[in-house]
Amino acid sequence: MTVKTAKPKVLVVDDERVIADTLAIILNQNGFDASAVYTGTAAVERARSVKPDLIISDVIMPDMNGIEAAINIRRLLPGCKILLFSGQAATADLLESARAQGHEFEILAKPVHPQDLLAKLRG
């Protein structure tokens, strides 16, 4: 009898739908159970219901930025790993504000190459 191990659940968050959907597809093809949402608010709601192992989120989004969403999700799921990515220079100010409040997040620069992301997740 073979015992199946659960795939790590990943939530991808980006207001650029093509990026979120593409990353979710790549992750699903590489042994993860990934889904995508397109707003920070949707990320918090989905995290509450799905309880992902990992969240990969853009920082700059129109309704709730990725750092605000990450802080809210950390309150709900303290053990959830959160990886942020952004191509915006404004991200530094947001990260500094989060650090001042006692929150630390790992950040990757956009564009994120899929192989680099997979290596980071597996490493």
Show the residue positions of the predicted features.
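Alpha4 helix (beta4-alpha4-beta5 surface) of REC/receiver domains from two-component response regulators
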Residues: 68, 72, 81, 89-109, ...
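Conserved acidic carboxylate
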Residues: 14
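Acidic catalytic/metal-coordinating carboxylates
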Residues: 38-42, 65-69
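Receiver (REC) domain active-site loop signature in two-component systems and cognate sites
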Residues: 61
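Non-catalytic signal-transmission and effector/linker regions of two-component phosphorelay proteins
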Residues: 1-9, 113-123
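Two-component/phosphorelay signaling modules centered on CheY-like receiver
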Residues: 17-35, 102-105
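Active-site beta3 strand of CheY-like receiver
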Residues: 50-56
